[in-house]
């Protein structure tokens, strides 16, 4: 029987069947093109985009077309992130010297300008605040003062987040606030006041309920209101100061590099005077929208409003949590006091450098041009020079407890800075500055200016609205800084071509690049809260409609009204801009 079985196994198949697979070889599943593209699309973009854009450079002679080719390639790489954003930003260091646009020395200098030093120094000072937990103390104290009912707590969290985000990075601010919200919500849920997440989803299988484990529980509307509130407040708060977000430094650097003789400079106090009022309006209206959408504001019979009404009973519970968190910080230390003094000193130095209404300290020192990078780095150096405590003084006295057994730490350590500073932003910002300067040196600026003269027939207000809409749309899908690097240089040349004040378009566009509310990938605060609270993309996309409409309308209105108070010449084409326009367009000034 065994012999017969063996024969049956090894009997060759009939002649009409084609054997393409050898005995013992396992058949492989068919390769799908969709799988190939899904896994290797980035490689295809990196390989094909430079080839497909080659006609721009090969069919047209001149440095301006070589620069345009590079701009197209980098723009696509930035938007698709086929290469890491920071790596794409390094391409001008390689390409500009080879293409004969700028020398290596000229290009590399643009990667460490005064604006960049100020930005990186500002991040380091903000990290000193984070290192000593001064930001937590401030946040918890303000929440204690505002109150802990659901609506008051939400308002307090949003306003604290907005204020802190003006000075420290949006991501760090959001990351700090998330655990505070989580602790409050968990305690409220334990007391039966509210729920953090919806009940698990069940499906009927064979007449029995089965838990759908593949779908984790998603947050309730009250939870969404708190988490999305701090994410949006972080993005909006960053619009308030020059150092609030990298996007602000991007358009400041590009504007000042392109228009060095401009009489309207982007200094610290003027920018705050321009942007803080609109920032407050954005934030307050966004708070009202989130309250209406998630907590039933002005809808007393809604389910959400009734849940908030029950939540008022938990105000004492929330207050206990906040009080305990504040108590855990202990009394304010000499470490925190010194950091707070240095931070206030830095801000005062920003405001008094060249205030305009009186001689600033930079005018009194000497005739050299002193920028805001100087006080920023001065404070950074002081953070390393000053001790975190003065226990070493016990060596000089017999009182005050035991003497320290080791060295006294400084206000911040380099190890903390090294791990926390987003060093890649140096290249991302520098790449934008290099592209802006390369477009001017190569003549691409002149080319774009000539091409955009036809837009002169449109009213300025229509152009402004279109620019804001385009910036808000693009920044929803890509890095804010990358989008600013792409559109700001184009707007600079367009403003010269159609003879309107460059700041009229550049400043609103730069602010609009920070207004990303729809997707987790839009901005780091969105990604942080989405991951922390398991927020579904569709919930964030729907919730982002309100803040998007609010910020677009508010920014447009403020630019047409308050903007003219801060910059009275925005409605005119100034003489210094006429000189740049003549140089860019190849015409005489008129």
Curated annotation (Swiss-Prot):
Q: Which GO terms describe its biological process?
A: citrate transport; determination of adult lifespan; pyruvate transport; regulation of triglyceride storage; succinate transport; transmembrane transport
Task: Give the GO cellular component terms, alphabetically.
Answer: basolateral plasma membrane; plasma membrane
Location(s) in or outside the cell: Basolateral cell membrane
Tissues with expression: In adults, abundantly expressed in the fat body, basolateral region of midgut cells and oenocytes. Low level expression is seen in the halteres, procardia, restricted regions of the esophagus and hindgut, base of the legs and in a subset of cells in the third segment of the antennae.
Q: Which species expresses this protein natively? A: Drosophila melanogaster
Q: How does it sit in the membrane?
A: Multi-pass membrane protein
The record makes one more remark, namely:
The life-extending effect of mutations is likely caused by an alteration in energy balance caused by a decrease in transport function.
InterPro entries according to UniProt:
Na/sul_symport_CS, SLC13A/DASS
GO molecular function terms attached to this record: citrate transmembrane transporter activity; pyruvate transmembrane transporter activity; succinate transmembrane transporter activity
Q: Tell me the name of the encoding gene.
A: Indy
Q: Which family does it belong to?
A: Belongs to the SLC13A/DASS transporter (TC 2.A.47) family. NADC subfamily.
Q: Does the keyword tRNA-binding apply?
A: no
What is this protein called in UniProt?
Protein I'm not dead yet
Q: Briefly, what is this protein's role?
A: Cation-independent electroneutral transporter (not associated with membrane depolarization) of a variety of tricarboxylic and dicarboxylic acid-cycle intermediates. There is also small, but detectable, transport of monocarboxylics. Transport is through the epithelium of the gut and across the plasma membranes of organs involved in intermediary metabolism and storage. Affinity for substrates is citrate > succinate > pyruvate. Fumarate, a-ketoglutarate, and glutarate are also transported, but not lactate. Transport mechanism that is not coupled to Na(+), K(+), or Cl(-).
